[in-house]
Amino acid sequence: GNECIGCTMKLYGNEDAGISRAHTCCSLDDVEDARSVAHRLGMPYYVFNFSDDFRATVIDKFVDSYLHGMTPNPCIDCNRYMKFGKLYERAKILGCDHIATGHYARIEYRDGKYLLKKAVDPSKDQSYVLYAMTQDELAHTLFPLGGMCKTETRRVADEGGLINADKP
């Protein structure tokens, strides 16, 4: 076991308040679900407001690239600058040695190097949006879902009594 904290990155305003969660992601309901899961697991839970950084480093870049005829993938920049940039820095300030995310990918240490590997479940693999991770980031990241299929993830969550076991 590890000593864990839970967190959500607030990346934009709450314009989705009152909208069905089927039509949005990262809604206020999702934040409350995450808080409930953290509480059930006995972990402290935080919401980190990175909305200004997200707009400047992900959204504005995406819009500019799109306007110049490119087809950008904002997930790559979000992972690079937000999860493994801002969140990793905040985690270090809080005394965390690692961050763990729900990405379906794996990390292997071999011959003195960390290798980013595809998830066991090829239909859920997300390693392609993590290609920009540095050796330091890989050394301090855990992908606990990478060795599981989605059905197994749901089963474990259900057995743990987590309210989000059936969430899409």
State the predicted function of each range:
Residues 1-132, 142, 151-153:
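ATP-dependent adenylation/nucleotidyltransferase module used to activate substrates
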Residues 134-137:
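His/Asp/Glu-rich metal-coordinating catalytic cores
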Residues 146-147:
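Adenine nucleotide phosphate-binding catalytic loops in nucleotide-utilizing enzymes
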Residues 154-168:
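Anionic-ligand-binding alpha/beta catalytic cores of soluble enzymes and soluble regulatory domains
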